[in-house]
């Protein structure tokens, strides 16, 4: 019986954007009673497949399952037999045939007894994905004692993977008494026949946070549970299960309580070969259908560790091949959640190799090409890595994220929405104990804009404070010394200066002689959100706001603006902010007809 085929809506959008003849590999999850869900693809190098370089970057359970062909590419047929031999999760590998730049005419076929059999498919949208699937994230540590040769690294990594798979590890779900070992789960209520969803429901929400969730819940999709809000990745709506790792002999935590020392230690063995003891801090992920039986979880977690070790091995051996003298370095796991993918990807980067070094730039460029991503914006820099909510909550304070999600519609007849592209934090009056009511609105708009560049991975610079802004403007001779420490407001020109000074970001300044003329720049704002996607600061008189979208009807000229209002002075309660209109759609009567307005429109740097 052939598998039932489903395709992620995220994947379909990515396939639609490919406009060059090419071929590549497909990756998916096999779950339930015979359903294959396609989630991702990569493009192959000209004339050869490269899935062996790619597959360890995916979470465990997200595996090679077939081939995709774009246009009249002839490589696909040549590679089909190779892929068929390498697919493990199904006896019927899949072939997708896509036209260039469109989903019209896309055909899906399973390979059955040496022939292709065309099959229908269903589309799984984002809400169903978030409902039906979750991720695990575990952290553990090992030491790798090896000589600085690819052969020795491969040999010792193989030994280490065998140790991982020998049944001596036990997994524990934090904040519970639930243990997972090679014979199944150990808990009074959960059994091997229990489902992953039962485990999700058994994980308690940290005390004191339930009310916060209730306040924010109205703006989230129904699929997003409290577990996603408290432990998931920033900007990601999947539930996430954290896992601790223990050895069955000692019950000692391998990772969270005692991570390995981050330095290399050197030893000389009797083999007359210098060996280094490399600390490996593993951070591994897996993707699971929530209806999966709990008895499978142990094997999946073991595979996630082994997959992370293979990624470390690949990174170490690449470095040994490229570096003169063959030196070892400490690898680190970095997880990414690229916008529009609908799944995580992992990279292993070596300590001591900065993001701007040519060798790192070349590796990222290769990743961009393999995943059909533009090389005009960052996806895999360290600053792009995921921030997980449990870790973010440990910080003294974090602003609200993406406050526009869930706002009431604009009600523009036949309008089209153009929105900020990516994540941002909402900054407003009185945050961080700064008494800036009446003068700090533009500073707050600047902080919101800076947060966008941080969260999109363009920089990891800290968000500038009011005082830092004032000191910088004095430093460049824009303001007198009396400005530093004052309560004087700033405008769009100063915002553009600060963006250049703090982030090296250029800005475009638009001038409008009155609020009544704002509709004349609606199309320009729409183009800005399509091409740049950054928040826009608008200043008029002594007031500043942040524009994060427009809804515009070309035929009628009707336009509304999606506004973040920095003048809000209340608590960070999302429901209040949306209901009271501090974040929401504003019509033309929001703007003063007698005031001129300047808009600071930040431009994305070309960076990857």
Swiss-Prot record:
Keywords: Hydrolase, Protease, Thiol protease, Ubl conjugation pathway. SUPFAM superfamilies: Cysteine proteinases. Its EC number is 3.4.22.-. One of its GO terms (biological process) is proteolysis. It comes from the Eukaryota. The keyword Cell wall biogenesis/degradation does not apply. PANTHER family: UFM1-SPECIFIC PROTEASE 2. Thiol protease which recognizes and hydrolyzes the peptide bond at the C-terminal Gly of UFM1, a ubiquitin-like modifier protein bound to a number of target proteins. Does not hydrolyze SUMO1 or ISG15 ubiquitin-like proteins. This is Probable Ufm1-specific protease 2. It comes from Drosophila pseudoobscura pseudoobscura (Fruit fly).
């Amino acid at each position: 019986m052939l598998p039932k085929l489903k395709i992620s809506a995220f994947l379909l959008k990515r396939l639609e954007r490919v406009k060059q003849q090419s071929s590549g590999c497909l990756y998916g999850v096999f779950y339930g009673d015979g359903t294959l869900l396609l989630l991702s693809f990569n493009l192959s190098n000209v004339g050869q497949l490269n899935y062996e370089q790619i597959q360890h970057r995916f979470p465990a359970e997200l595996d090679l399952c077939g081939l995709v062909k774009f246009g009249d590419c002839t490589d696909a047929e040549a590679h089909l037999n190779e892929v068929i031999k390498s697919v493990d999760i199904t006896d019927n590998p899949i072939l997708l045939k896509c036209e260039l730049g469109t989903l019209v005419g896309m055909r899906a076929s399973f390979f059955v007894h040496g022939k292709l059999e065309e099959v229908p498919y269903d589309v799984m949208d984002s809400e169903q994905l978030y409902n039906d699937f979750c991720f695990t994230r575990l952290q553990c540590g090992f030491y790798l004692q090896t000589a600085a040769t690819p052969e020795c690294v491969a040999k010792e990594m193989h030994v280490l993977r065998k140790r991982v798979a020998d049944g001596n590890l036990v997994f524990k779900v934090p904040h519970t008494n639930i243990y997972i070992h090679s014979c199944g789960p150990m808990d009074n209520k959960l059994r091997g026949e229990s489902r992953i969803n039962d485990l999700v429901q058994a994980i308690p929400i940290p005390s004191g946070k339930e009310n916060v969730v209730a306040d924010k819940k109205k703006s989230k999709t129904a699929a997003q549970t409290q577990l996603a809000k408290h432990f998931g990745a920033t900007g990601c709506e999947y539930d996430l299960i954290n896992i601790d790792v223990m050895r069955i002999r000692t019950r000692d935590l391998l990772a969270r309580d005692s991570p390995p020392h981050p330095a290399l230690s050197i030893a000389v063995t009797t083999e007359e070969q210098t060996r280094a003891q490399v600390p490996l801090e593993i951070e591994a992920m897996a993707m699971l259908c929530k209806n999966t039986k709990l008895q499978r979880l142990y094997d999946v977690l073991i595979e996630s560790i082994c997959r992370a070790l293979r990624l470390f091995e690949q990174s170490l051996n690449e470095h040994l091949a490229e570096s003169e003298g063959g030196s070892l370095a400490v690898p680190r796991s970095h997880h990414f959640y690229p916008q529009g993918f609908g799944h995580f990807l992992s990279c292993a980067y070596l300590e001591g190799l900065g993001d701007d070094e040519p060798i790192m730039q070349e590796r990222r460029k290769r990743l961009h090409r393999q995943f059909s991503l533009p090389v005009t914006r960052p996806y895999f820099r360290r600053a792009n890595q995921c921030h997980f909510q449990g870790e973010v909550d440990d910080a003294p304070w974090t602003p609200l994220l993406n406050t526009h999600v869930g706002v009431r519609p604009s009600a523009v007849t036949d309008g089209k929405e153009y929105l900020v592209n990516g994540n941002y934090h909402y900054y407003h009056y009185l945050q961080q104990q700064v008494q800036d009511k009446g003068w700090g609105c533009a500073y707050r708009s600047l902080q919101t804009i800076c947060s966008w560049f941080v969260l999109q991975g363009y920089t990891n610079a800290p968000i500038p404070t009011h005082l830092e802004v004032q000191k910088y403007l004095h430093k460049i001779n824009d303001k007198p010394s009396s400005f530093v420490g004052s309560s004087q407001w700033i405008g769009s020109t100063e915002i553009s200066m600060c963006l250049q000074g703090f982030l090296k970001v250029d800005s475009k300044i638009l001038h409008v002689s009155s609020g009544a003329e704002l509709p004349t720049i609606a199309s320009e704002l729409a183009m800005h959100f399509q091409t740049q996607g950054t928040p826009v600061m608008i200043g008029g008189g002594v007031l500043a706001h942040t524009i994060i979208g427009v809804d515009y009807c070309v035929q009628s000229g009707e336009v509304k603006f999606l506004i973040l209002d920095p003048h809000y002075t209340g608590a960070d309660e999302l429901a209040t902010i949306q209901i009271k209109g501090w974040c929401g759609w504003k019509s033309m009567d929001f703007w003063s007809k007698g005031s001129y307005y300047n808009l600071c429109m930040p431009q994305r740097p070309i960076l990857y």
